[in-house]
Amino acid sequence: GENQSSHYNKFYFVKILKIVEISYKSVRPSLSIFDLWADLLRRSAVSSNFGLIMEEISIDIFNLLDKQPEPARGNVLLAKPTVDDACFKRSVILLVDHDSEGSMGVIVNRLTDYTLADVIDGPDYFQEIPLYMGGPVGLNQMFFLHTLGPDVIPNCIQVARGLYFGGDYEAVKRYVACGEPVEGKMKFIVGYSGWEKGQLADEISRFDWVIQKHIDEALIMGDQEADDMWKAAVESFGEKYRTWNNWPTNPSDN
């Protein structure tokens, strides 16, 4: 009822205040707590939707963060916590290609319910090798990210130090079929994330993404749950971004 709604609104207002106070202070230490209260009161006076209030505040906070570098192959894109697209929410994306005509990346923390056995005939242990969803484009295509290099997988592309993308499909099949280790060395990915000319730059300018130039190979090739990998990536981005881990997973549900 109305009283219950009012109770929840008060509860989440206090909750939001604490999160936003920490976030604002991390990027604007001179901010007065009284100014913060006034800002939140002003916003709540025109909207009872706390998801919307947090989205507005997030824009203010993220616009105070450091200017983002130009994206390049091998960079990691980290979705800001208020991105609510089902595919990209709390995603960690490795850019495998970028030029003036567009960009291509793969989400590395979106595990599916499928295994390699669902797409390739092979030994029973193929059922133990997970498939990841790399993005909404080309879902009928499978890609592989690995640390093996061209000596093992010819024709692969080096995307970062010690990290490779693609290569000779038959060589990959032979490697896996022989029972060679896969965990931490290979990720099989269905689909990819693509951006047309200028599209990624626009999204970065809105702070939908932040860029990490120096990637953690162990993190990218790890098998953490999606949210855990995203939080670990946030930690690697430094102090200004750590308050993102305080952000509710589903603020609009509030």
Q: Which ranges hold each PLM region?
A:
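Aromatic (phenylalanine/tyrosine) cluster motif
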Residues: 8-13, 24, 34, 50
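A short aromatic-anchored loop/beta-hairpin motif
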Residues: 55-189, 193-254
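Polybasic, lysine-rich low-complexity intrinsically disordered segments
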Residues: 3, 16-22
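Short, charge-rich patches within N-terminal targeting peptides
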Residues: 2-8
